[in-house]
């Protein structure tokens, strides 16, 4: 391959790498911009996250040290009465599924669905396209740097008879009745479950 051809190929690859995060970034702006939460505190937080997205082109990537968008999912069973929770290895608590966005994720919704699928082992999940809640919390990521997760939370539904499979990102998976979540339930999870019930997506 000639030097010119190599240069063109390198330029094309660079453009692709730059385009994918910006598509993800724009989708986060679009999703949060269209969402109208009824809770004033959630709406105020939505505006704050949108302002952060406006100032940081890398806001959806884990390398963004001041904080970054994450995508999580409350995976419900077919009846909407139970939530699939993961026993998180680093936190040591039962949490909803989710995690960091990847540059290959075309949209924020796709990121949440990918995380839910990978961590549950369930194919054919369906996701509500509108966020259920937002939650911001401090965390030290795998990179070892203190940061914040600006977590956009969605509701996902499993098909009847769905079989779960524990991934290497979890110590365990368990279906919990929404009316009997763990005693030490994280505020973000409790808020998400409440929002899912208010929206009619959960029972």
What are these regions (language model features)?
Residues 12-48:
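Alpha-helical and coiled-coil interaction segments, frequently adjacent to or embedded
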Residues 1-8, 203:
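Intrinsic disorder/low-complexity segments enriched in small, polar and charged residues
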Residues 164-195:
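NUDIX/MutT-family hydrolases
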